[in-house]
């Protein structure tokens, strides 16, 4: 019996030692997460995003971003394939393959699809489907996690590099890399600018905890989501920045330009990919607890909780409207566009199809 107790004691010491000292990939810092107010006020729960119609994307998954161009819908995907969808017939074809992990996408003035590819950098896809790299480095450092982009009136492409420490390709998946950046919270993300006139890339501003969705405002500033802090920033091309939304009820992902409001104001659509994690918020000031969590099996770590939420805001961050699905039936919605055909198309990190709903 004594031997059994000694054996159990030794095992307990091994487990304690493992949870306390085993090396992990992150070196977390303390911060203070704001109190999660939940779905109240402007975010009061509704079911207006429920029962989305689904458009087939074949055997790929994760239609991360969506654009409409000349009546056709284009979506990116986790495995690098770009699909062209006929929204009237619900048919699709492979338009291009980046051989990476295609995330954000916009159309430039020449009809090229500009892609933020987490593995490859900033790419251009010609109308013939030819893929070329615009940039994959800045100031001698690799662009490790190109995430989202928008194009200014002068043609400059502003795009996010979500993490310079946890590259999507080096870590293995976009999701795994994003979780490491958020758990560590040192803020290695940045906003970059690529000028196609002289093929130069520069850092606009850095220090973000997973810099994510990017959208151009009419005054030339850039709206950018910072996923790890539940914030939206308004950043000028010279790097001057201010927070226009704080303490969102979930993790903001993509942001896209929306239709003008009745009074002429600009609007933008933000996708909230997951509810906030109470455990992460409660342990925001406890780096050691987050280190211990990283030593646990992945199934025991904080998990994303799907809750469908698209938020429409004005350029100052005031909430205009929300579309919600508390059931999260369409999983991990990353964002949305309101297209010329009267539909709102909803993208996703993990769904096997593209969601849409007819707007009244």
Feature annotation, model-predicted:
Residues 2-360:
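Sequence-structural signature of mature extracellular/luminal beta-sheet repeat domains
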């Amino acid at each position: 019996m004594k031997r059994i107790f000694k054996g159990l004691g030794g095992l307990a010491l091994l487990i304690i030692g493992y949870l306390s000292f085993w090396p992990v990939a992150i070196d977390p810092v303390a911060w203070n997460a704001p109190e999660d107010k939940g779905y109240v006020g402007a975010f009061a729960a509704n079911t207006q995003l429920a029962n989305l119609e689904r458009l087939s994307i074949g055997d790929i998954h994760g239609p991360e971003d969506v654009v409409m161009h000349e009546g056709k819908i284009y979506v990116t995907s986790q495995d690098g394939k770009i699909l062209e969808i006929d929204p009237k017939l619900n048919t699709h074809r492979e338009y291009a393959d980046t051989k990476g992990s295609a995330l954000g996408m916009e159309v430039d003035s020449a009809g090229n699809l500009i892609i933020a590819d987490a593995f490859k950098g900033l790419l251009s896809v010609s109308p013939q489907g030819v893929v070329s790299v615009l940039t994959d480095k800045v100031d001698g450092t690799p662009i490790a996690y190109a995430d989202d982009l928008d194009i200014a009136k002068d043609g400059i492409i502003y795009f996010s590099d979500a993490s310079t420490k946890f590259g999507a390709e080096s870590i293995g998946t976009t999701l795994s890399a994003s979780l490491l950046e958020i758990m560590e919270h040192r803020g290695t993300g940045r906003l970059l600018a690529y000028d196609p006139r002289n093929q130069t890339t520069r850092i606009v501003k850095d220090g973000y905890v997973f810099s994510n969705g990017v959208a151009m405002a009419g005054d030339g500033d850039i709206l950018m989501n910072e996923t790890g802090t539940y914030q939206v920033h308004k950043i000028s091309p010279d790097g001057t920045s201010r927070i226009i939304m704080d303490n969102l009820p979930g993790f903001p992902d993509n942001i896209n330009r929306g239709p003008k409001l009745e009074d002429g104001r600009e609007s933008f659509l933000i996708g909230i990919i997951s509810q906030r994690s109470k455990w992460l918020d409660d342990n925001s000031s406890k780096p050691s607890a987050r280190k211990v969590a990283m030593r646990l099996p992945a199934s025991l770590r904080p998990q994303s909780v799907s809750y469908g939420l698209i938020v429409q805001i004005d350029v100052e961050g005031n909430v205009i409207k929300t579309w919600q699905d508390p059931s999260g039936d369409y999983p991990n919605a990353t964002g949305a566009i309101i297209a010329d055909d009267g539909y709102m198309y909803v993208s996703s990190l993990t769904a096997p199809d593209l969601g849409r709903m007819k707007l009244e």
